[in-house]
Structures are given as C-alpha cells and as structure tokens.
Amino acid sequence: MLHPRARTMLLLSLPAVAIGIASSLILIVVMKIASVLQNLLWQRLPGTLGIAQDSPLWIIGVLTLTGIAVGLVIRFSQGHAGPDPACEPLIGAPVPPSALPGLIVALILGLAGGVSLGPEHPIMTVNIALAVAIGARLLPRVNRMEWTILASAGTIGALFGTPVAAALIFSQTLNGSSEVPLWDRLFAPLMAAAAGALTTGLFFHPHFSLPIAHYGQMEMTDILSGAIVAAIAIAAGMVAVWCLPRLHAMMNQMKNPVLVLGIGGFILGILGVIGGPVSLFKGLDEMQQMVANQAFSTSDYFLLAVIKLAALVVAAASGFRGGRIFPAVFVGVALGLMLHEHVPAVPAAITVSCAILGIVLVVTRDGWLSLFMAAVVVPNTTLLPLLCIVMLPAWLLLAGKPMMMVNRPKQQPPHDNV
C-alpha cells in the first residue's frame, strides 16, 4: 500500500500530465503556424515579386505592416490581446479566456513578421489561463495557484525541451512550507514539465547548444575573466533596463495601439536593415547562423549585440506580444563572441556562457534560469563550477537594481490603453 504522502502526490499526476501535453501542443501549433506564415512573408512572397529577401524596403515594409496588424488585433479584439508583456513577469495571474484568441493571433503575427521577441510570455499566459479555467470546472477543489504552477511547469518543459529548467525554477518558489518536503511539492510540476518536454521532443528538438570549442580545465584566471564578461553583459542589460520604461511611456502617450505598434514596427525595420536578417526574429535560429558565419568580425558582433538589444527594447516598449528571454540569449551570444574575438586568449566557451548568464540574469532576475540557459547553450560540464562562481558577483551587482519591467500606471486598464 502506498503511503498517504504518495497518494497525495498522485492526486494531481494525471492532470499534470494532461496539462504538460496540452501546453506543448499549444506551443507546437502556434510555432508551426508562425513558421508557415514566416516562410510566406520572407521566402515565397519576395521570390514571387522578384524582391531580395534582405531588401531594406522589404524589411521595413514587412515589420511596419506587422506592427499595424498587431495594433489592430490589440485595438479591436476582445480582451485586447491580453496584458502588455512589458508590465508583466514571465509567470503572472491568469487572464480571462476571452483575451486568448487575440493574444495568439498577435503572437503569431509578431513571430512571423520578424519582431525581436520570443514566444515564452504569451504561451505561458495562454496555458495558465486555459489550465485555470478548465481546471476550475473539472476539479473545483483545487485552487488556482496549483493550476498556475502546473501550467507554468508544463510550458517551461515544452519551451526548453527538458524538465530541468522547471525543477530549478520551482525549487526556489515552492520551498515555502517546512511541513511538506520540497520534492513532494515538486512532484506534480515535474510531471507536467516532463510531459511537456517529451511531447515537444516528439515533434521537434529545440536547438540551444552552439558548436563552440570545448573548454578543458578551469583555471583561476578564467574565473576573473568570466566575472568581467558577466559584468559587461550586465552593464549592457542595465542600459536596456533604463531605456525600457522611458521609451514605453513615450510610445504610449499616443494612446492608439495601431499607431504605437506601427511606429514600433517601422523602427524595428530600420534596425533590421542595419543589423541584417540575422538580427530579426526571436533569435534562436539566428544565433546558430551567427556562430556558423566565420566572416563576422569583432565590430560585426558588437553591432549585432547593440541592434538586437535595441530591437528587444523597442519591441517590448511598443507593446508587441512576446517574451524577452530568447532575444536576450542572442545578445549574450553576440557579446560573448565579440569579447572572444577581441581577446582570443579567453576561450569562447567562457565569454559566451558568462555573457548569457549576465544578460539573462538582468532580464529574468532568476539565478537558476540564467545558469540553465548558459549551460545549455554552451554544454560543457567543466564550465558548471565556473558559472556558479561567476553567478555570485553577478548577483551582487544586480542586488536592489530595477528589473526589466514597466510599472503599470494605476489608472491604466488591465489590457492596454485603447
């Protein structure tokens, strides 16, 4: 016979697995539709019209029209496409289900149109809202927070293709009760994360790891080098943190989301022309292209890092529906490659992983997630002790500093000005 603790853990196992699978399927469907639309906008249409895919007019035109289209969705859809991600954490309160169709359409348009944001925040919002709404009907005795945790874990597992990230993140948020062991509380979320990761793996495998030269043995000088790299990445990220609320306030003085997002799309188009096609989209596939291109110089990497960071700030400030983690990873990779090219004596594995750690820490203010992203992009067990040590001064630098989030004015409606 099972112990009562085991029976308690098993109560939410089936719902956890179902939520994990559903979270992954929603992500897969959204990404597939966005991929088809992206291929139409950036491959087939330019070819049919006889226009180069990297034509400045095409890049500016597509991104401007994408901004106008997203603005129309936010302006006229029920629920106004959910909350403004610039004002929300990654895991937030559930939104009304009526806002989800507009949010999904706005996300797909942004992903396909080349906006420098990832899918993580909108997908998380959709999955939490559905889990809470459906779960409250089927099992009303289970509180909303439980459904929120399961949906968040399932989504994290689906996004990163592994339950490890969910285990790390929730180990710090669920350890609030001394009476219930941590792993008892982690059981159902890890079931959801594992189900989400396995379901994603059946259809595609997220490619985070980069072909970077293997790092051999850690030396004391490497710790100092890594700490300096992380500090440089943090400094770059804090510039974006300073700019975001100010640009957000300036853009939203216009009140009309169609105008705001149209202008935002136009600015993104100009940035895309300067940075080239590799600086567009969420950044995961593009960072693979960046590493594979041996022709890039130190100045090229610097330009890509600056352009991508600026595009991230503009996209978030304009109200595009998307997340900030994936483009931040691209910025970290570009910064790391730039620093390695500038100082070849420091291995690329150190510069890239520590730059990712620093910039993701600025964006998420989550130490475990930052370590995870650095470790999966540069998969090398020798780096893990170094990353853990470098995390300490990085965390000290950010203690008490503002987050990359906009404080929503009290008079503003919950789903944007309209």
From Swiss-Prot:
InterPro entries: Chloride_channel_YfeO, Cl-channel_core, ClC, ClC-type_chloride_channel. One of its GO terms (cellular component) is plasma membrane. The keyword Cell membrane applies. Coiled coil: none annotated. It comes from the Bacteria. GO terms for molecular function: chloride transmembrane transporter activity; monoatomic ion channel activity. It is found in: Cell membrane. Keywords: Cell membrane, Ion channel, Ion transport, Membrane, Transmembrane, Transmembrane helix, Transport. It holds the Pfam family Voltage_CLC. It is a multi-pass membrane protein. The chain crosses the membrane at residues 10-30, 54-74, 99-119, 120-140, 149-169, 186-206, 223-243, 258-278, 300-320, 322-342, 343-363, 371-391. Belongs to the chloride channel (TC 2.A.49) family. HAMAP family: CLC_YfeO. This is Putative ion-transport protein YfeO.
